[in-house]
Amino acid sequence: MKKILFPTDFSPAATNAFIHALEFAKIVQGELILLHTFDLPIYDNQYFPENYNVIFDSLQLSQFDAFKDEIPKLRAIAEEQNLDKIKMSHRLMDGDLIYNIKKVIKEDKIDFVVMGTAGETGWGTFFLGTNTGSVINAIDVPMLSVPLEAKFKKIKTIGFTTRYRTKDKKALKEVITIAKKMNAQVRCLYVKTSTSDVSETTIKKWDTEFAKEPVIFSVIPSDEIKETIIDFILFKEIDLLVMLAYKRNFFVELFKPSLTEKFANTSSIPILALREKKSRNFEEVAAG
């Protein structure tokens, strides 16, 4: 059974992402591990309280009580979605969020991470350094990131951007694995700029290789890469965008609200970020 880590602070963004996590667990036949972390108080050594252990125990107990109170609410959500059969376990940990996420991934052999994100600029804050954005750069497993505005709906069309590189082909195969489980179609976009070095022969080879797969290739000539990708998301009605998480700066530019007025409509799209260097092969992870 695949293991899906779901870090939560019980915020509206996290609660919204929880539904996506449940549905994703259903698709990959997985179980959810809910993680909640809390920070310990920081004291200067000069003023370190003698009763620190008492303070720690009190804080830990209050966090446990709060955590315990939230669990029934999540189970109620699972029941409402008819997904209460999904296996769930819980972990409460003190300390740094990213450190604990990496620790759980290693200890529990996590296959996927699902997190919610929120902010005035939607995906802009995600890629500019929120907890979610920091996590995506720190882990080596696929991560589904869900903005607050992204209410769950059946995924019919998955968008994937490519530059026709070998690493892109491997990633596309991984995306197709997931698409088949969702009974979804993959729309693969290549923005061909005036300086493109991708040959027509390469493009045709990909067309031939994936001819029997649920994927449609689109080659759009343009030097406005980011605008073209956003138009693609909108006009092809993309429900989930999949990208290799190797160029964070590109993500930042792509989802800047100032880039286009159309951003408001694209900021509600979940993003599945694949790492180039993964601890395990994604196809093996996704296969059920």
Positions of the model-derived regions?
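Short glycine-rich, flexible loops that bind phosphorylated cofactors or substrates
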Residues: 13, 121-122, 167, 249-251
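Short beta-strand elements of ligand-binding domains
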Residues: 116-117, 142-148, 271-275
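Charged helix-capping and loop-helix junction motifs
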Residues: 128-131, 202-204, 255-260
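A short acidic, glycine-rich active-site loop
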Residues: 53-66
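Helix-enriched interaction subdomains in cytosolic or periplasmic regions
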Residues: 112-138
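Structural beta-alpha unit
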Residues: 72-113, 210-261, 269, 276-288
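Short, structured interface segments
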Residues: 132-150
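Small/aliphatic-rich secondary-structure junction motif
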Residues: 1-54, 157-219, 238-240, 266, ...
